[in-house]
């Protein structure tokens, strides 16, 4: 046929600056609203499993550390359900990643896609983020792509790279 899809993009959460990143711990700036994923967990898992079963690549937008964690859980479940499949699933815009999830990317063969422009933000933007997360949490979890380079295909900048230069702000 004329049209063929090879992947599915699923948005699980949005940017922390708007209090829309799905987090393991609350924001530190006094925000008391509840952040929910775009899709309920069970529905997201069903979508991932169905796409995986059909041989489609999943590209899931997971900015917050809870979104990353649940995205990895969904990929792990799909892998157990369809063990013999070749796959190349991605978590995109991975801005916050908890320590316990770092090795899971390698174990599951999941690519953690990041945005180089956001990985090296302007000083004012970092100050804003420090208001949303305490400095220790921000330093520990924010953009692991800057500090966790290692052998393996799991840290390529990709989803937004065509719009973001390697040298943000020409630094």
Regions found by a protein language model. Name each.
Residues 1-69, 104-117:
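Metal-coordinating catalytic core of metallo-dependent amide/deamination hydrolases
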Residues 10, 96-97:
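Hydrophobic pocket-lining residues within nucleotide cofactor-binding pockets
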Residues 48-59, 66-89, 93-94, 100-103, ...:
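His/Asp/Glu-enriched, well-ordered alpha-helical/loop segment
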């Amino acid at each position: 046929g004329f049209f063929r899809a090879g992947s599915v993009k699923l948005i699980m959460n949005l940017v922390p600056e708007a209090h829309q990143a799905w987090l393991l711990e609350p924001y530190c700036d006094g925000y008391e609203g509840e952040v929910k994923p775009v899709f309920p967990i069970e529905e997201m898992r069903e979508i991932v499993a169905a796409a995986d079963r059909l041989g489609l690549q999943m590209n899931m937008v997971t900015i917050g550390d809870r979104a990353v964690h649940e995205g990895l859980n969904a990929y792990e479940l799909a892998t157990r359900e369809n063990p013999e499949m070749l796959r190349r699933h991605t978590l995109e815009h991975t801005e916050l990643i908890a320590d316990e999830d770092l090795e899971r990317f390698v174990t599951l063969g999941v690519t953690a896609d990041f945005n180089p422009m956001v990985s090296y933000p302007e000083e004012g933007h970092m100050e804003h983020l420090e208001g949303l997360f305490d400095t220790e949490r921000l330093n520990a979890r924010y953009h692991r792509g800057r500090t966790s380079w290692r052998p393996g295909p799991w840290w390529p900048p990709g989803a937004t790279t065509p719009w973001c230069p390697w040298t943000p702000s020409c630094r």
